[in-house]
Amino acid sequence: MQYNPLGKTDLRVSRLCLGCMTFGEPDRGNHAWTLPEESSRPIIKRALEGGINFFDTANSYSDGSSEEIVGRALRDFARREDVVVATKVFHRVGDLPEGLSRAQILRSIDDSLRRLGMDYVDILQIHRWDYNTPIEETLEALNDVVKAGKARYIGASSMHASQFAQALELQKQHGWAQFVSMQDHYNLIYREEEREMLPLCYQEGVAVIPARGD
């Protein structure tokens, strides 16, 4: 397995990242096709044996059960310092409403850490752009999460390049923690990100985490 620095961070991640949306209890959340824990654990173990150290999940995957399954498997099969764990915030989980308000972010990170059984995540990503919350409120809350030691870094996902550029500029102006990664829909067939997002990320030193787009 080959490893690379993740953008400007001190994280070294495997070239392959294991996306964990498929892991989750089928009777929780919106996807009945997910793999329950007994089927998920061998895949996570095999990924670790193959050298994958980068795991990406989200608070909303299978109503939080993806985080629970991934957290338990990593505790059993790996040392915390040997893996890079990323999760996301935005979508509804249980009675937590959708969005990126300060209250939602602060509650969500605590809930994610509890489900993962971890003291911190390596990357907390915003899953979407929140059109109903001022971006300044979102960015300041993310900065406070980093200052509290609950996330080492923050990342973004699924937004327009103009929105991402606005957020990066506001972070610079206020001295807030900067986005270090962009997880976007990008593959050999869908290459729209080559127009604006990838050049922006290259210019800003932001790592790109290609995903199928969920």
Describe each PLM feature range.
Residues D95-Q125, H185, I189-R191:
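Active-site gating/metal-coordination segments in enzymes
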Residues G24-E38, R92-L106, H127-N132:
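Active-site mouth loops of central-metabolism enzymes
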Residues A73-V84, L113-G117, V146, L168-A177:
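Acidic (Asp/Glu)-rich catalytic clusters
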